[in-house]
Amino acid sequence: MASKNMVNPAVEPSMEDDLFAREVAEVKQWWSDPRWRYTKRPFTAEQIVSKRGNLKIEYPSNAQSKKLWKILEGRFQKRDASYTYGCLEPTMVTQMAKYLDTVYVSGWQSSSTASSSDEPGPDLADYPYTTVPNKVSHLFMAQLFHDRKQRHERLSAPKSERSKLQNIDYLRPIIADADTGHGGLTAVMKLTKLFIEKGAAGIHIEDQAPGTKKCGHMAGKVLVPINEHINRLVAIRAQADIMGVDLLAIARTDAEAATLITTSIDPRDHAFILGCTNPSLQPLADLMNTAEQSGKTGDQLQAIEDEWMAKANLKRFDDAVVDVINSSSSIRNPKDVAAKYLQAAKGKSNREARAIASSLGVPEIFFDWDSPRTREGYFRIKGGCDCAINRAIAYAPYADAIWMESKLPDYEQAKEFAEGVHAVYPEQKLAYNLSPSFNWKTAMPRDEQETYIRRLAGLGYCWQFITLAGLHTTALISDRFARAYSEVGMRAYGELVQEPEMELGVDVVKHQKWSGATYVDELQKMVTGGVSSTAAMGKGVTEDQFH
């Protein structure tokens, strides 16, 4: 008869509570680090540790996150900036590493060039949510490989010769685009987990609604309420804490140009929601439904909506109150009353603001924010820099950096935003999108373009990035080379590619060596005792022509 198979438990029951208490103490010690001095966590160390498994895993993302924090902390304190751009593929990441200290992975670029479904499209975040983490992995694995390759080359040379060899830090921290999180809070947590597993040092997440997400420079953006986006930021931090990683969370707000919001549930959003001030109009949705049922379509429906909107006289509630104050014959000193109202109503809910107006003797105000709601049920909102500042202040305790998406590279607006945030949180790091969607030639003269990053850095924008520079530079050289190649054949390759590579010392000119052929030969020789008749870089390799 076979003996009973004894299987060990996952953890010794007599030690379980002691191990838990020890790990909780370690987490509390971790959270006491100055790194977290501005971070608010609405959960406990006990809750975090209880969500971990018994096997402790050390993620490379943690080392990269610490490195990124050190970079941004140093830049912010010196009112300097780390600036980078969206990287497309491994060739690009190795060239960026020579000159830039961070790497960006764009959702827009991934959507158009690297969807995990292989179906390209615009930046609507409708690609599988593994897409951007997979691109992070693609680049991070390349970073690790080229770091190994370079280290081997240096250690294979005498110390006296190493000054002639490259000593590039290929392990530049990667910051990636998490869009809106691709779903609810558990989706945000799973996405965060993927980014950490793939090697990201930081991620940014925006306050748009997931089903209607748009590129920051498209129309039709729909915001979620402030509390919903805070929950996303908390979800990111909680997941990173469970995994023991210092991942940076960057909060992006699209409030500057947004026109819609999903709900009026958060009082912090109330001051920016638009209401109809014309009591003679029926609700827009009712009007549109009636028109549809009568057979109207397309342009006819649009004309009906446009006419309704023109008559509705949509306003923020505060603006409606001030207009009533200024037009009321019963109010003496309307300027003083308006100032008192605006000061008292700041940050208040609509119900509270109505009560304040009434207490100051303001006549009853007709203001209906349900009447203009869209067919999808969204409320209309008047965005702007003030709306973005309001949201940034709410996000600050939960975010390592904050980014306001903007329509133009407007220094004065960037200054207004920075000063608004820093009036409440002076140590808040800021990020800025140096977008290729802007027409830089018409936006500012060349000398101002050259100083723009530096001027923004002085305001606290310590991380700046061109989202799609990888895409545009690839398109530019591809168009230029393809055109010339079609006209002059191999002369185009020599003049436009190979000769400039050699003159500028671009290492990819020796593409076999760049790809790691020498390194892999040495791996093979190590295994076979030092000799390999099939070495890739042996006698006859054509790269000898470039010595």
Swiss-Prot record:
Residues forming the catalytic site: 215 (proton acceptor)
Lyase found in the keyword field: yes
Needed cofactors: Mg(2+)
Residues where substrate binds: 106-108, 216-217, 252, 433-437, 467
GO cellular component terms attached to this protein's record: glyoxysome
Pathway per the UniProt entry: Carbohydrate metabolism; glyoxylate cycle; (S)-malate from isocitrate: step 1/2
EC nos: 4.1.3.1, 4.1.3.30
Record carries keyword Transport: no
Gene Ontology biological process terms in this record: glyoxylate cycle; tricarboxylic acid cycle
Keywords: Glyoxylate bypass, Glyoxysome, Lyase, Magnesium, Metal-binding, Peroxisome, Tricarboxylic acid cycle
Quaternary structure note: Homotetramer.
Family of the protein in this entry: Belongs to the isocitrate lyase/PEP mutase superfamily. Isocitrate lyase family.
Cited NCBIfam families: isocit_lyase
Name this protein carries in UniProt: Isocitrate lyase
Name of encoding gene: ICL1
